[in-house]
Structure formats: structure tokens, C-alpha cells
Design a protein with these regions (language model features):
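Hydrophobic alpha-helix immediately C-terminal to the catalytic Tyr-X-X-X-Lys motif of short-chain
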Residues: 48, 52, 56, 86, ...
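Conserved Rossmann-fold NAD(P)-dependent oxidoreductase catalytic core, especially the SDR/UDP-sugar
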Residues: 1-40
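C-terminal substrate-binding subdomain of Rossmann-fold SDR/epimerase-dehydratase oxidoreductases
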Residues: 103-105, 111-167
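Structural signature of the Rossmann-like NAD(P)-dependent dehydrogenase/reductase core
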Residues: 12-16, 20, 65-71, 111, ...
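Protein kinase-like catalytic domain
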Residues: 6, 57, 95, 126-130, ...
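Active-site helix of classical SDR
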Residues: 41, 45
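Hydrophobic positions on the long internal alpha-helix
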Residues: 1-5, 12, 52-53, 121, ...
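NAD(P)-dependent short-chain dehydrogenase/reductase
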Residues: 54-109, 115-117
């Protein structure tokens, strides 16, 4: 992709992820330039892509842009087993009148973003004037962070008998 962009003078958008971080990365107000030592192949490939994007911008002038997305959630796409899918799956359980078994530990906060907001962020970045960009590897973006109990409390306002347990 980057080599084709270099050859044809195209801009490249690469979605990255907070999965590019690791345990040593600061969890609060994560700096734009920070330590990235992920422990998963997913995270390693995201860091690799960020570094390659930076390299192609610096070496060849390829217009590379990326966003480090948090977990993306949607009311349209059914949960598919990802880490953040519990935040959608819990509503399916509530609507079906089922007890929800939460895969997370109590008090686990996760950063998430609504899919239309994620798309708008990507579009805004691609429409930005190139000379105004300070980074080429990836931009941190944030939207919301909550734990399972917060969602459960909100659901109980509408479905008082709703029950959630932890694995």
C-alpha cells in the first residue's frame, strides 16, 4: 500500500488502534509520542504500520495519516466477540430478557467510540491541510470511557429486572 502510494502520489489513511500501546504506556492522558510495547500480534502490527507510515512520509514524502482508534461500538453491527463488544452485547441481553455474563473484571474501564464518530474523525483527518499536521504516524483520539456497572445501572432504569454477573 505505501509503496503504491509512493509510486502514484496517493495519500494513505491507515487505521491504528490503542492496541498499539502496552502496559508501560501511560493510561491517563496518553501522550501522542509515547512508549509502545504491545504484547499481542495485533498491537505489534499496528506499531509496525505506524513506523512504516512515518518512514514513508520522512523518506519519500508520502502523505500518510492514521488515527489510533479506541474500541469502536455500533448499534447497527452485531457484537462479534471483540474485547469491547460487551458494551453492545449487554443491550442485546437486556432486550431479550437474559442475564448478561460480563467477560471483564468489575471496575474495568475501556475507551470506546461510536462508529459514526470514528468515521467522522477519519474523514476530518483526511481533509486536513497537510502542512498543519504535526504527526504522520498516528493521532490519539478519545470519546468515552466507562465500566460495565455504569452501563448496567443505565439499563436498569429502563429494564429494572436486568441482571449482570461477572465470569
Amino acid at each position: 500500500e505505501l509503496e503504491v502510494a509512493r509510486e502514484y502520489g496517493c495519500a494513505v489513511f491507515t487505521p491504528s488502534s490503542i492496541g498499539s500501546f502496552g502496559e508501560a504506556t501511560p493510561h491517563v492522558k496518553t501522550p501522542q509520542d509515547t512508549i509502545q510495547r504491545p504484547r499481542t500480534m495485533y498491537g505489534v502490527t499496528k506499531v509496525t504500520t505506524e513506523l512504516l507510515s512515518d518512514y514513508y512520509y520522512t523518506k519519500y514524502g508520502v502523505d500518510t495519516r492514521a488515527v489510533r482508534f479506541p474500541g469502536i461500538i455500533s448499534n447497527v453491527t452485531p457484537p462479534g466477540g471483540g474485547t469491547t463488544d460487551y458494551a453492545v452485547d449487554i443491550f442485546y441481553s437486556a432486550v431479550k430478557g437474559e442475564k448478561f455474563v460480563c467477560p471483564l473484571k468489575p471496575g474495568t474501564y475501556m475507551d470506546m467510540m461510536y462508529m459514526p464518530d470514528a468515521l467522522n474523525a477519519a474523514i476530518s483527518l483526511m481533509e486536513a491541510i497537510p502542512t498543519r499536521l504535526k504527526h504522520r504516524n498516528a493521532f490519539n483520539i478519545a470519546a468515552m470511557s466507562f465500566d460495565p456497572e455504569e452501563i448496567c445501572r443505565e439499563i436498569k432504569k429502563h429494564v429494572p429486572d436486568f441482571e449482570m454477573v461477572y465470569e
